[in-house]
């Protein structure tokens, strides 16, 4: 039972972390994928504030994060990468008081008219990651490591 619960929690922490208050939308018909450089510019050296945690995307592909579900806190130290097909992936061993699990999570990014769309792969819903111009409710990426 604990194993099933911990796997479900990892899925929530590693994958369901991004949506927050974002509105689910369909991807635009004439979008293009973000390039590796655009993804690096978007994430590298920044902390991403999730609904229940924070992740930091360091230079040279290092990744660390924490998340809290109920009264249980989990942490991860691992790797992240930007790919030319618009994907950003992070992976590592999530650890909490009662469990440890490896997870790899990927998001794909598209852009149209400066507006960035994102979805978790392979089956997530598209949502607006960042409006053009920025709006309240856009995903929060802040310079520096805010996980400490």
Question: Each predicted region: which residue ranges?
Answer:
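Bacterial N-terminal signal peptides that target proteins for export
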Residues: 2-12
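Lipid interaction determinants
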Residues: 21-79, 83-148
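Bacterial N-terminal signal peptides
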Residues: 10-20
């Amino acid at each position: 039972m604990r194993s099933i619960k911990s796997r479900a929690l990892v899925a929530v922490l590693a994958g369901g972390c991004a949506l927050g208050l974002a509105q689910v939308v369909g991807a635009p018909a004439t979008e293009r994928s973000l390039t590796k450089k655009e993804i690096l510019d978007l994430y590298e050296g920044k902390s991403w504030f999730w609904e229940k945690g924070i992740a930091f995307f360091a230079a040279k592909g290092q990744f660390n994060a924490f998340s809290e579900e109920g009264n249980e806190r989990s942490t991860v130290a691992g790797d992240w990468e930007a790919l030319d097909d618009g994907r950003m992936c992070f992976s590592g061993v999530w650890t909490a008081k009662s469990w440890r699990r490896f997870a790899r999570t990927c998001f794909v990014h598209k852009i149209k008219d400066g507006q960035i769309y994102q979805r978790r792969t392979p089956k997530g819903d598209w949502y607006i990651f960042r409006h053009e111009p920025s709006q309240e409710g856009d995903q929060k990426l802040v310079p520096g490591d805010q996980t400490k």
